[in-house]
Amino acid sequence: MTYSTSSTVRLIAGRLALDFVNTANWSDDGTVIDEKLSNRADLQIWMEALSLTEASQCATIEDLLALRAMLRSAFLGDGRSLNISLFDYVSPPKSQLTSIDLTVSHLPLDNLIVISAISILSDPREYQRLKKCPGHNCGWLFIDETKNARRKWCIMETCGNRSKAARNYAKKTRQQRR
C-alpha cells in the first residue's frame, strides 16, 4: 500500500537515510514486499511528513529506489565497504558550482539522503547500534538509542505485538494438543 492510497508515513528511525530505506517492507532476502513510493505523489507525502518540502526532487523515482537499495546494502554490510559512488550523489559537476547555497533544505533530496547515510556509516557509535527489525516481512532499519542497547523491534506496537501474539498462539496450540 502506497502513501497516496492511505498508508500512514511512519518515521521510526530518527535518521533521514534510514527512514528513506524504511519506505518499503523487506523480505529476509532483501526483496521489496510492500512498496510505499510508487510515484511522485507518494514521494511528496513522505517529504511533507519529514518537513522536506523545500528540497528539490531532481532524481526520478526509479533512481531513488535504486539509491534506496544501494543504501540498504551498505547499511547491512560490514560497515567498511562504504560505496564510493555514494559520494557521486553529493559531488555536483563543476559546471553547477556557480553559486553557493548553504541552505541545506534546498539541496536535492537524494543529496540529503546520502549525506545522512554517510553520517551513519562513518560514525562507529551510530553504525554499531544500527539494527534490522526481525519482524516478519518488515526489515526496517533503526538506530538503537536505548541505554542498554536492547531495542529489538522497529515499532513494538506492530512487529513486537505480532511476535508475541504468534508465540502465545503457538503455546496455546501446543497445550491443546496434549
Named regions from a protein language model:
Residues M1-K132, G139-W140:
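Short helix-coil boundary/hinge micro-motifs
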Residues I113, R125-Y169, T173-R178:
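BZIP DNA-binding basic region
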